[in-house]
Structures are given as C-alpha cells and as structure tokens.
Amino acid sequence: MEPAERAGVGEPPEPGGRPEPGPRGFVPQKEIVYNKLLPYAERLDAESDLQLAQIKCNLGRAVQLQELWPGGLFWTRKLSTYIRLYGRKFSKEDHVLFIKLLYELVSIPKLEISMMQGFARLLINLLKKKELLSRADLELPWRPLYDMVERILYSKTEHLGLNWFPNSVENILKTLVKSCRPYFPADATAEMLEEWRPLMCPFDVTMQKAITYFEIFLPTSLPPELHHKGFKLWFDELIGLWVSVQNLPQWEGQLVNLFARLATDNIGYIDWDPYVPKIFTRILRSLNLPVGSSQVLVPRFLTNAYDIGHAVIWITAMMGGPSKLVQKHLAGLFNSITSFYHPSNNGRWLNKLMKLLQRLPNSVVRRLHRERYKKPSWLTPVPDSHKLTDQDVTDFVQCIIQPVLLAMFSKTGSLEAAQALQNLALMRPELVIPPVLERTYPALETLTEPHQLTATLSCVIGVARSLVSGGRWFPEGPTHMLPLLMRALPGVDPNDFSKCMITFQFIATFSTLVPLVDCSSVLQERNDLTEVERELCSATAEFEDFVLQFMDRCFGLIESSTLEQTREETETEKMTHLESLVELGLSSTFSTILTQCSKEIFMVALQKVFNFSTSHIFETRVAGRMVADMCRAAVKCCPEESLKLFVPHCCSVITQLTMNDDVLNDEELDKELLWNLQLLSEITRVDGRKLLLYREQLVKILQRTLHLTCKQGYTLSCNLLHHLLRSTTLIYPTEYCSVPGGFDKPPSEYFPIKDWGKPGDLWNLGIQWHVPSSEEVSFAFYLLDSFLQPELVKLQHCGDGKLEMSRDDILQSLTIVHNCLIGSGNLLPPLKGEPVTNLVPSMVSLEETKLYTGLEYDLSRENHREVIATVIRKLLNHILDNSEDDTKSLFLIIKIIGDLLQFQGSHKHEFDSRWKSFNLVKKSMENRLHGKKQHIRALLIDRVMLQHELRTLTVEGCEYKKIHQDMIRDLLRLSTSSYSQVRNKAQQTFFAALGAYNFCCRDIIPLVLEFLRPDRQGVTQQQFKGALYCLLGNHSGVCLANLHDWDCIVQTWPAIVSSGLSQAMSLEKPSIVRLFDDLAEKIHRQYETIGLDFTIPKSCVEIAELLQQSKNPSINQILLSPEKIKEGIKRQQEKNADALRNYENLVDTLLDGVEQRNLPWKFEHIGIGLLSLLLRDDRVLPLRAIRFFVENLNHDAIVVRKMAISAVAGILKQLKRTHKKLTINPCEISGCPKPTQIIAGDRPDNHWLHYDSKTIPRTKKEWESSCFVEKTHWGYYTWPKNMVVYAGVEEQPKLGRSREDMTEAEQIIFDHFSDPKFVEQLITFLSLEDRKGKDKFNPRRFCLFKGIFRNFDDAFLPVLKPHLEHLVADSHESTQRCVAEIIAGLIRGSKHWTFEKVEKLWELLCPLLRTALSNITVETYNDWGACIATSCESRDPRKLHWLFELLLESPLSGEGGSFVDACRLYVLQGGLAQQEWRVPELLHRLLKYLEPKLTQVYKNVRERIGSVLTYIFMIDVSLPNTTPTISPHVPEFTARILEKLKPLMDVDEEIQNHVMEENGIGEEDERTQGIKLLKTILKWLMASAGRSFSTAVTEQLQLLPLFFKIAPVENDNSYDELKRDAKLCLSLMSQGLLYPHQVPLVLQVLKQTARSSSWHARYTVLTYLQTMVFYNLFIFLNNEDAVKDIRWLVISLLEDEQLEVREMAATTLSGLLQCNFLTMDSPMQIHFEQLCKTKLPKKRKRDPGSVGDTIPSAELVKRHAGVLGLGACVLSSPYDVPTWMPQLLMNLSAHLNDPQPIEMTVKKTLSNFRRTHHDNWQEHKQQFTDDQLLVLTDLLVSPCYYA
C-alpha cells in the first residue's frame, strides 16, 4: 500500500511542525478542515472568533449570575453548535477552561437531572479527542464523579419512586467517567482501591458493584514511570481473582473488559504469557459452542458470556512481542472452531462467531494504525520490541482467512465477512484477494445460486480499493477489474431485485475508483511501462464497450418496467418502494460512470442516451423517471455539450404540441408532451451558468405550460421552474471526478492508470464550486417577478374575498408559489420582525449570531418570503372559514408555512439522510490502516458540501419572533381542524416549528389547553382530539405535556386531568381513550425529577470569572459589577422559592382535580398517577397529599390501591428520621493487629462478626454493649478506611413517642393506622387475590410495612396482632402472602428498636412463624422463602438469633410429610444464604444435622437437601489471598461420603435402582443405603455445577468412576431418576473449567475407568472426554503429557471388544482431529494401516445354532479398529480434502467386502464423505488423480453403496 509511505499525509505542508499563532493570537486545538475548502472560507475566521468570544463572555456571566437556566443552558447549547460548525477551534487554555467549568457544573450535587445530562453530553464532546490535552494540561478529580454515579446508578430512593431518572442516564454517566479517566491524578488508583476493596465479598451483590466501579474508574493510561501508582497496585490481585473463578459470575465479564482496556493502553508493559492458555480457554468457553455427543449446557453459561468486542480488544493487544504465544493460541482457536463457520451450520451461537470474525481484523488494523501511521501524542507509544512485525501480520491473516472465506456464504448474510475482508485486504491483499476472486468468478457464471453472487460481490466491494490500487504486494490486482466489470453486467436483471442492487453498487464502487479512459494508444508512444501497466493499457480499450453494454442493460431494465401500463390508469402518484430503490441505484451508478469517463466515451454515451430518450415516449411515473434520471446524469457531467442536444429538442416538441390553445384546457394531456416536459424539468438540474444561454426558450416554455389545466402537466412545469431557480441560486460543487481537473488531457502529459484507486488530496482538492453570479441572481429574480408575483396578487384578492377562484385554480397557484419558495430558499432573507419578549426573563444576552452561507441578501428588493407569508395567512383564514373541506389546498398551505419558517436552501431530513449515506459509503471504502482522511475525492467533496448544508440549516438561529408566533398559531388552528389528514400533517409541521424556536412552547401551551377547558362551550371532538395530539407530540420532537419545567407542567397536568369533564370528551370513542392512555404512558416514561434548588457553588463561579477574562478572542465587555452579582443571587433565591411554590401549587391543583365530583374514573387514575410522580427525596409531600394517599390505601379500585401503597412507602421514607452513626476501629474490638497485606475471608480480626451461640446478646446489657454491623460484606475482604456503625440507643431518635411528639405528617399516618376499622379494611384488601396463580411476594407492600414499623416502632402492634394470628391460621395462598409481607416488614423495620421491644416482638413472632411453617403449602412456600430471605438481608445475625434458632429447631421433623420438610429447608436456606460467611456455626450445625439424613427417600426432599448443601459449601472458595474458611469444607465432607459409598464402588456389575420410593421399614443393606445416598449427592453436585465459584475437583473426581458405571448409554428418557441424574451430572462436570494442576488427576481417573469391566463406563469415558477437552482446550494443549495420554486413551479404546465403545472412540478421535487437538501424523496413519492389514481367521462351517459366533475374534476387532481409525481421519475434515485423504479413501475402499461390522463402517464413512463434500465437489475433485476418481465414482454410486 504505497500511498501511506509518503511522510506526513494529512498535514498542510508547513515548516516547523506546529502552526505559529497567527494574527488572531491563538492556535486552534483542532478545526474542522473541510471549512477551509468552502467557497467563502476567508470569512469564517472573523465569524467564529466573534461567536467564541460571545460564548465565553456570556456563559461565564450566566454562571457568575447564578443563572443556570435559561442563560447557562442557552450558551452551553451554543458551544455545542460551535463545535459542530467549527470543530475545537479554540486555544488550549480555553479548552481547559471550558472543561473545568463544565466539570464543576455537571457535578453540582442537587443539579436537575436533565441539566446534568445536557452538561455531561457537552463535556464528553469536549474531552472526546484525548490527544489534544495531555495529563500535564488537565487534571480532573475522580470523587465528584463517583459521588454522582453512587447517587444516581445506585440510588437509595429511586426504587421507592422518590427520584425519576431517564433510561439514558446510565450510559451517559459511564461515558462521562470514561472520558475523564485519562486525567485522574496519579494517586487516584490507590484511593479507589482503598474505597472499593472493602466491597469485594464474592457472595454479595456488592462484589458486582466493586468490580463495576473498578471497570469504569481505574485509570489505565498512565505513563510508564507512574505504573507503580497505577495498575501494578491491583493487577496481580484482580487477575488472580479472575483466574481462580470457575463458574461465570456476572462480574467476571466486567473484569475481562477491564483487562482488555489495560492491555490496549499498555502494550508491551505487561507480560501476559503466563495467562494466555487460560484466557483463550475462557474465550472459547464463552462462545457456548455445542460439542460432544451428549450435550446439556449449564444454564448459567448462556447468559453471562463475555462481550466479544472486549475479548477481541484483549487478544489484539496481547499479539506480537517476542514470544508469539498469542498468535499460536489464536491459530489454535480458529482451528478448533473453523468448522462451525461452514454455511450448513446454524444456531444461536453463530452471531457471536460472526462478530468475532468481524471485530478481530478491525481491531488489528486499528492497532497497526496506532503503531505505524498515527501522529504521536502524549499517550505512551508501543515499545519497538512489542510492535507488530510484518510476519505477525501475515501469520494473523493466514490464521483467520479460512473461517472468513467460509463465512462469506453464512446463513446470517455476508456482511460480517465483507467487513473482515475489507480490513484484511488492507494488511495483506496478496493473501486475501485471490481466494475471494476464486469464489467470485464461478459465482458470476452460476445461474442457479443467486445468493452466491450477492455474497461474493459484497465481499469484492469491500476489497475494491485494495484490489484496484495494486501496490507492490499485489501488482496484478488491477488486471482483474475489467473482467469483473464485464461479467457483472448480466446482474442488471429486472427479475431479481437484490442481485440488481448489489450489481449497481459493485459497478459504482469500481467506477468511482478508476478513470474510465482508453489508454491503449499509450502503448505505441511509451516504452517505459511495466508488464502490468502494458496489460492494463490494452485492457482499457474495453471501457467504451463496457459503458455501452451497461447502458443497454439499463434500457432493458427500464423497458421491462414500462410494461406495467395498468398502473398508469390508477391514481398512484408514487413508485413502489422497490422501484424507487432501483431508480436510485440506476441513476447514481450511471452518473458515477459518466463522471469517470473520458470525453470520447462520454460523447458516445450521450448520443446513445439522447437517441433512446427521444425515440420513445415513456409514462412519467416509473420508466419516465428512470430515463430522465439517466439524461440528467449525462447533462450534469458535461452541461455544454448535453444542453445543446436536449434543450432545443424538448423545447421545440413542447412548443409544437402546445401551439393549439385547446391543449391548455385538456384534462388529459398527450403522453409525448408530458414526457418532454418531464425530461426538460430534469435536465435543467445542472450548473446554472450554462443554463443562461437558453433562458429565453425556457421562459417561453414556462409561460406556455405553467397554467395548463391538467394537473400532471402544470406540476411538471412547476418542477422546471423549481429546478431553474435552484440551479441558478444555490452553492454546490459542479463535478465529483476522482482526479481534480478531469481526464481531458493528452496521453503524453497524463497517464490515467497511475490514478487507479488514488485517494483525494485534501490540500489540493480543487473543488469547482457553483457560486451564483449577479447575472444568475437577476435571472432568478426575473423568474420570481414573472411567475410568482401574479399568483400572489390573485391569491391576495381571493383571500380578501374580492375574487372567486375555483379549487383547482387555487391549487395551481399554490403549487407555483410553493415551487418558487423552495427554488429560491437561500435567496430570500429569513423572516424579520419583532422578537416575542417576556417569555423568559434572563440577565444575560440570549442573542443569536447569523452565519454567512455564501450569498449577501439583496435587501433593496422586496422580501418575497414576507409577502408570501402575509398572502398565505390571509388565504388560510379565508379557506378555513368558507371551504374547510378543500383539503388539498390546505395540505399545500401547511407545506408552504413549514418552508417559510424553516427552509433556507436545504431540508433537515434530507440533510440527515445524506449524512447517513455519506457515512455508509465512507465505511464501505475507507482505509482504516492509514487513516488521515485518505478518502476518494468524490467523498471528500461530498463532506465539504455537507458542511455547507449544515451551515445553511443553522443559519437562522432560534430567535422567536412575532411572525413565527402568528404562523405557529395558524398551525395550531390547522392541527385542531375538522379533517384528520389535515390535522395530522399540520401537527407534524407544528412539532417541527416548536423544536426550532427558543421558549416558544411556553407561549403556545395556554392556547392548546384552551381546547381542554371543561367550562368552555362549543369545542368539537375534532378540536379536542387535535389538542390532545398537540400535547402528545411525535416520537422524536418535544412533548408539550411533559416539558421539564415547573411553569409548564403546572398548567398542563391539571388540564389533562380536568379535561375529563369537558363535554367534548367521550370515553365511548376508543381513539380518545387510547390518546389518554398514550399521554399518561408518555408522561410516565419521559418524566424526570425536576429540580427545586438551582444554587451554583462557589467553585463554579471562580472558573466562570476566569473564562470571562480569557483573551483571544474576546469581546471587550466589562466585568460584572458587584450589584449585578448580588441581584443575580437574589433572583436565584427567588427562582428557588418560585419552584417550591409551583411544586406545592401543582400538588394542590392536581388534588382539586382528582377530588372533583363526577370526574370519570379514568381521569382520577391519571391524576393519581401524576401525583405519584411528584414524590421527591428532598422535600416531604404536602400534608393534603399525604392524607389523600393514606386514605386511598383502601380505595375500591385495585389500580389506585397499588399506586397508594407505593406512594405511602415513599412518604414513610421521606419521614424517616436519621440515625446517628459513629466511627469504630475494628481492630480494637477484635484485639488483633490490622493485617499487613490483603487477606480475605475468616481472620482473627473479623471473627467478632460471626454468629456465636455462646455470646449472642440475650440481655439488655449484652445487647447494648454489642457492636452490630448490619451489612454483610464489611470486613470480609478488608476493612474500610472509615468504618461506621450505628450509635447507641440513647443517641438515636426517640422511640415510643406519643401523638403529641409527632409532626403533622406523621400524625396523619398514626391516626389511620391506629384506627382498627381502617386496619381491618386494609388487611382485607391486602389478602385478596389479584391474578390467580401469578401473585408473588410483593416488595412494595413489604416496603410499606417496613416503613411503618421503622418510623412508629411497635405503636400499631396491638391493632395488628389479632389480624396476624388470624391470617397465619388461614392457609389460603393470598392470606399467607399478606402475613409474610407484614412479618418481613416487621423484622426489618425493627432494626433500631430497643432490646425490650425486640424481645417482645419475637415472643409474638415465634409462635406465628411456627404455625406458618407447619401450614406451608405448594403455593406459599415461595412467599415464605422470600419473607425470611428479605428479613435476614443486610442484618446482623446476632440480632436475629431468635429467628435462626427457630429455623434450626428441626427442619426435617417428618410431621406434615416430606413436602413440609422440603419447604422448611427452603425457607431456612433463604435465611442462611443472605448471611453468607457470618454464620459458620449455624452451617456446621445444619450439616451435622443433615448428614445422617442424606439417605432420604423422598425425591423433593433430596433435591432440597442438594440445594441446601450447595449453600452450606458456597463459602468454601479457593480464591487467591483468601484464608481457609471456618465454615464447612467440601473435601472433608466428600471423604466421609466416599467412605459410605464404598460398597457401590467395589461391585463390578451394573448398578440397578431397586429402591422403591415407599419401601418398607425393614433393615436395609449397605448397597440400598448407598444408592439413596448417591441420589442425594447427585442432586448436590448438579445444583452446585452452576452456582459455586470453584469446584473442589480433587475430591469429586473420586466419584467419577461410579457415575461412569451408572450413566446410561442410549438417549432414552424412560430411565429412572438415578441414571438420568448421573448422565446430567457427568455432562455438567465435563464442562467445568479445570485448573492446570487438576489435569493429571482427571486423566488418572479416566485411564483407570477405561480399564473397567463395564463397557458402559468405558463408553461414557469417551463422551466425557470430548466435552472436557473442548471446554479446556488450551489448558490441555499446554500440557504435552496430557495430550499424549489422551491420544493413547482414545487409540487404545478403538480396539475395545465392545462395538459401541469402538465406534464412540472413532467419533471422539475424529472430533479431536477436527478441532486440531490431535494431528493426523504418519505414526498414527501407519498404526491404523497396520491394524487394517490384520489377517482374519478363515470361516469354518459350524453346526447351526452353535453359540461361538456372537463373540468377535480378536483379529476382527483389530482390523475394525484400523478401519475405524482411517474413517475417523476422513470424517475429521468435513469441508476440504487434505493431501493425505485420497489415498486413505482408496485404502478404505479395499475393505468394502470385509465381514460386518467392518463393511458397515466403510459404507457409513463413504456416505458421510459424500454428504459433506457434495456441495463443492467441483473444487474437491482437483485433489484426486484420474484413477482415484474412477474408483471413487464407482464406490459412491455403485449398487453396493445403496445396498
């Protein structure tokens, strides 16, 4: 790839590197380069300087005056726009000041969330290009961000509905942290570790939180001299943790993301080699591929896989370096998964595999770019020793190319493969392009497989640039271009849409890259050409032929679409969607081809298209559009030559056909006339200067045709007018050639072949701009005067009522007006007028700056825009008053109003779609390797044009003027008019206008709400609906009902509620009901808590002052006076007071609304819903609302009750009194010194946290002297720097208060809950069933009760007690659930009660719980489990000793049957699991209790015991730096179990399950006991397979031989439980992740079992092995002995006496060969061939009926083993034919006549070979000699094959 070897591409050639500060006094950080190429570039500096100065000054003042809104937001928005227009065009000093100011703003603690997001987005944008600011320039603290994340993402009040955050907030916050991370101070890492390490308790949710924090916060881009303060502090600790976790917990994936980032930022500074096998094994496991013969996936693995994107980044960063270990493993990874890419495979795992393929090359290219081409910046460069060498790149491309080529034809489409190939071809075109072409040529020939064509073409498009530019690695590339183009032509096929589109894209791509110039003459003139150049020269003679053939194809396409004449008659104006796509493809491809043609070829093409278009007459809808497009393309390329042909022709035809005046009034016009009008209107879309020659002719045509009666006719004529105006007044590039200056030079001076695939040069782009000349402008005004003026006069009179016009005439006039307006949009100055004042008071200027877009407005002429506005408004009122049903005119008026307001030469939606398509084309052809904007010239020109359009869209600013106000009001009137289509169109324009002007929504809301007022008479249903739609808004724009502003929602929300009383409201109409539903849903979805406090802290103000003082550029505005600043502060305090007043006011008005008599229930519910949004965490709800919600706990409607429950729970949280905390020193309590290094787990210094029945506090004194720690994770990993616990009872808020001691709000709640009637009613409602069988324990209700008991301690127990006793006794599902929710609330609410109160509480609860647990049923056990688990969550176990002792009394009493026992265990498990590591004593007691009961007969109890065991041993983890736990250990337990299972181990025959479920009492023998025990143990192993962190393999291995014996071989579900479980258990165990030191142990067991006398065991060893090896592939490959052992094991089992075992060994062997674990080497081949040659004993005639025949002879077994081995080798490469295969097949075929089972094996092998190789047989045939082919064909079709 030569171009990049030129130094410093992409920098203007300037001496001395960094540009000097110019006269402007500052060096911009990074401008948008495209601005320099605009035709008016020289005016931009002054413009941007002025804007920047205004932004700095006003943003600074706004902050200093404490005015966040509107001033602050207005000017930060202006700064965002500034960056979009000019890039980062400010000095480094200003850049830093902007960042610091926004950082301070974003981290204001009480900032309203929507403002926070606005500031955050801008800050992210300012920090985006991190190379612009080094760590020396900027330092940002990390704590404010942490406080924000903690407050928002881990909000304590959000779940109670006291805070409403938008969904986007999580991503914005994470991106913000990511952007600030490079600038955290050097000591940040240590501080973060100190802060979050204490959260690392692997059994607790806080672990997830800690790792999330590490992942998003830890800085990894520190310079090498600071590494000791960076990752070296945590790397060993976290990688150790990752390596030792065996089952994927959720946080493991986040660790991977962190390591990936660390690796990328520090290539060459970390030695990953020791971890590589583990990393690759885990990545392979995480793909969840189906392997092996009996597959059951661990359910855990499916959900928590790694994010492929991060895994790829990690792999890429580790590549290279001296050891090459990663490349070796990567090759191994692809070897083992390549066959999954074959198109015949499909499954849910395929997406991941495709993503891997697509991301890897992309990532490697990015790394190469960084190492070789990127401009060096302050970020640490990659050391030379670790840069990727050319060899590394070659190795990489070679290892990935096979799967990519397979993926080309994948079921999911070829997109990923094409993207991968694009990047691979940048690196190694010579390895990548030839195989792609090999697949492309046949695909272009095939007729039967069109999908192959689309797939290969899209891949060739990806590699097009690499192919065409050739370069020294792949010089022959360009020679393929012409053959490909010629062969692609048949793809232009009217019958196959997708083929047609991809062909267009293909041809367009290649034409853009190559000048289509015939250079064959150069061969005679020059003799210094290379071989390839000569070849290309002679080939280019075909270009002309290609262009002409392409045109013929297109004409064919067009003619076939004309056949659908029937559509002509119908009124469908539109083409179908597919037709319009084909039209687009055709026109853009044709225009690309002509742009790239030499003059000679162009002239031939022009003549051809002219002849075609003038010799036919086309219908104007489909075919006509396509032909006209082709003609337009031709005219655009060479206007002079083309206009000469077309204009006179069309004009003369049109003049002739309109000679007769009758034509003017015809309803239906002659086809020829229409076609010529269409053609003329399209070919005038060219360079305006060239049109001036023909102006007289064109004006004549307009005069003749603009007033045709036929709508189709005058519409085409209007198009002509529109295009003439646009062509003469707009600014646009006139050519998009791939080389500046075109190809029209003699071959002696210019050799086009040098320009094949050449990128455009940004610094010499040579854009030819069309800038309107004065002549063109005056022509445009002449057109407006001649054609627009008369229409306006007519319409003016019509609006005044002086002139009667028919509807058709009005429509015609409006059409002319609209076309004039959009034709001259950028000629007409924007609307002038008075601004609308007093909408929003502000102390800073909110002025807009006008942008210059290349034209000075001519203000001496009258402004047509204003005249149109006046006339149209008058006409509109006339039509609405007199003929509202003239909808067609109204549609046009709506369009005109929209364009008057917003159209300045380009439409926003067109701009957006062009920006999108620009990005798509850029992606499909970009060169990510060299970067530096090396795009092709046409793309660069397009990008400059987009920059110009962006400016025209922002030219106006957003000032809201009187004239805008009038027009928006007109739109509102139209939006509430009688016809739904008119309303719909008007509403869309209305929403667009609302989004365009500052603060206009506040002006318009009252007008919309007028239609909803209940007291207003005469509102029609249409107006009512229209107004509701106006409130609702569309999916993208503003929603008036929910502006985040008190002033607005104070009006809209109450209006929505009381509109229920309007007489226009009817709940019978489903459309209205749905509208209200949508409104309520949208408000709930979009509402974010609105701020009450807008104070700005001092730190912000200080930076704001600096910003105002910043020079270069600055406007010399004096600093603010102290009086002004005082006034600002005063206003700000008033604003806070206003906000509060508005808030209370809104609550009041809503309550008034909801409490109105005869308000329909729907509106009552909406009102209550809105009220519940107004709960906040910084302000208690007003008393009236509290009373309202409490009373509604007993409302009749369940919807209301549910809302009230949530609300009251929130209110109780607001009323919660704060509990005092104090700091303790844990080491003093334990009396142990602080551990010096990090040791997690049970240590002497955290022992005091454990539950210890000897020291639990049983008296008041003990209780009050204990130090309780409620949260479970403290102290496990390490102690926090500042450990706080709750202070003693006497310092806490007073309990047992009388009513007088309470606040008013509390009294309201107190009164209701002390009232027995109220409580009785409440309990009745709560114990009703909601949805049968669907109800669950409800956390909302639990929160309600927890709040009640926390805030009022035991005040309500007396009233509740009888209810609780009565509920517990009732065994109904809903009553049990109700009591469970209350009890959980009681236990958690009693956290701060005094000892006496708690003791009394447990006296009440214990009997209740005992009753409940003995009445437990299948419907309620889940609820009781949830109740106990919730009760124990985050509570100190020593405070709950009553509960634990109660639960442990006797879980398995047998009373109430096995089911109750199982449920009690479930409940107990819930409680203990919440306590994690702090109750070792209880776990030991439980284990001791359960061990004798492991032989339980009942299945449900066994399952439950298995699950409980998992939790008992959960704490026994082998994580690094963790002490052995005091809780029970697995090894000791397993040893005791093995002892009891001995009797089963020693027996050789099959173990039958002869234990009946309900067996007698008699004494059982050891085996029966053993089998029962085994069943429970299996349940335990299955339960822990996915849950525990690490598997204690060593001990469990000893159980394997037993399972091997039991597991059944056939897949049959009728087996008993024991066998099924054994099989499942083996499958789960085989997928487990092994540590390297466990490998020999496992193999030991497998080898031992392979000698077992049970063939079931030997068979199962093989299925186990398949999965185990694949799931631990690189761990095994890393251990040579292990590989030898496995090889020996499989090969020896091939000679097993049992046929099934032999066959399974063959399958296993073939699998191991296929994933490249073993290789087919000569010793193996020789071994099998020897075995095949084993002589078979002669057949003896035997007596009929003798037995001897059934046992196979040893010789037969050996011979069969050999044949199986060879068969395995054949089947191990299902998709290709390696060199050794033909001979093997011949050897196999020799055994076709051997005795069974050999013959069968050979047949099976051959039939499989045939099946897998059938698809690409043409390709595979090449590998065989002719003789071999004869034999093979014989075999594969011979009759014996079918026998």
Curated annotation (Swiss-Prot):
GO MF annotation: an example: lysine-acetylated histone binding
UniProt repeat feature HEAT, residue ranges: 475-519, 998-1037, 1179-1217, 1354-1392, 1636-1674, 1680-1718
Main localisation: cytoplasm
Record PTM Phosphoserine, positions in chain: 1121, 1614, 1746
Cell compartment(s), UniProt: Cytoplasm, Cytosol; Nucleus; Nucleus speckle
Ranges annotated as biased composition (Pro residues): 12-22
Gene3D superfamilies, per the entry: Leucine-rich Repeat Variant (1.25.10.10)
Any matching Pfam family: HEAT_PSME4
Region (Bromodomain-like (BRDL)): 1650-1738
Single GO biological process annotation from the record: sperm DNA condensation
Residue segments, region Disordered: 1-25
GO cellular component labels: cytosol; nuclear speck; nucleoplasm; nucleus; spermatoproteasome complex
Keywords linked to the UniProt accession: Cytoplasm, Developmental protein, Differentiation, DNA damage, DNA repair, Nucleus, Phosphoprotein, Proteasome, Repeat, Spermatogenesis
Bias kind Low complexity: ranges: 1-11
Function summary: Associated component of the proteasome that specifically recognizes acetylated histones and promotes ATP- and ubiquitin-independent degradation of core histones during spermatogenesis and DNA damage response. Recognizes and binds acetylated histones via its bromodomain-like (BRDL) region and activates the proteasome by opening the gated channel for substrate entry. Binds to the core proteasome via its C-terminus, which occupies the same binding sites as the proteasomal ATPases, opening the closed structure of the proteasome via an active gating mechanism.
Assembly and binders: Homodimer. Interacts with the 20S and 26S proteasomes. Component of the spermatoproteasome, a form of the proteasome specifically found in testis.
Family: Belongs to the BLM10 family.
Domain notes: The bromodomain-like (BRDL) region specifically recognizes and binds acetylated histones.
Protein name: Proteasome activator complex subunit 4
Organism: Homo sapiens
Gene of this entry: PSME4
